[in-house]
Amino acid sequence: MSEGVERSRLAVAGTRTRLLQAGPRDSREALVFVHGNPGSADDWEALVGAAGGTGLRAVALDLPDFGETIAPPGFQHTVLGYAGFLAQGLEALGIDRVHLAIHDFGGPIGLVWAATDVEALASVTLIDTGILPGYRWHRLARIWRTPVIGELFQATATRGAFRWLVNRGEPRGLPRAFLDQMYDHYDRRTRRAVLKLYRDTDDPGAAGAELAKLMAPRDIPALVIWGEHDVYLPAKFAERQRQAFPSAEVHVLPGSGHWPFADAPETVERLLLDFLGRL
């Protein structure tokens, strides 16, 4: 475990989600990390610890049916459902000024939350995610969105196949421990949640224009970090984040793929802490 990171459980929306936290626990201002798929609060452990070490409160939650957190009965595995869960989590933590850090599907989840409480958004860090004008689903997402085929694919995802698939297109390769951590959490409930979430999201680029219209006039401080070789969300979308965040600081990392916080952790930590330190 990273130094200074506390692991606990937090009662939210009828379940007890896993919480990673560092820094002053009573601060109402916090850096809030939202993971993507496949992922969990564990994705952010090192960055939670690093940010907490600067005196900023930092938190990361498991989303329902990811990591070690079981969704409550009736939970909707949709962007709106997860955004509502995030809102309730922030309320339970007493956080009302948010520096949002998001990755992958944590992007639409976090940005939809932000659209409902834009006054609470102090800054945003987008890591291979954000508004995606004109984006069409990648091949793996199309498999997940297809009935029967998606279920068969999920049922046959062995550890070895998972490692190969996730590492595909990653120039540096991802750390073995990171891959195994993701697979260990990729159980039946998470695999079902992934199918539901992707099947509910017909057009991942559709909300971008409305979000940009809402966010752009506010010129919220933003940091964009994108792996140059992301095979799921192409790096051309990095600069397009300025449609929503006109003054965004954009960094496209050579040699990185979809998980730059895993394949270039020192660079991501430096960029994030430098950005937050200037706010």
Model feature map: region roles:
Residues 1-31, 53-56, 95-97, 270-279:
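Alpha/beta-hydrolase fold catalytic core
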Residues 115, 122-152:
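Flexible "cap/lid" loop of the alpha/beta hydrolase fold
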Residues 20, 60-102, 270:
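Active-site loop/oxyanion-hole signature of alpha/beta-hydrolase fold enzymes
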Residues 218, 224-226:
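Short beta-strand/loop motif that positions the catalytic acidic residue
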Residues 229-233:
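Acidic catalytic loop of the alpha/beta-hydrolase fold
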Residues 21-68:
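Conserved HGGG/HGGXW glycine-rich cap/lid loop of the alpha/beta-hydrolase fold
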Residues 248-279:
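Catalytic active-site module of serine/aspartate enzymes centered on a nucleophile-bearing elbow/loop
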Residues 156-217:
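Conserved alpha/beta-hydrolase catalytic His-Asp/Glu region
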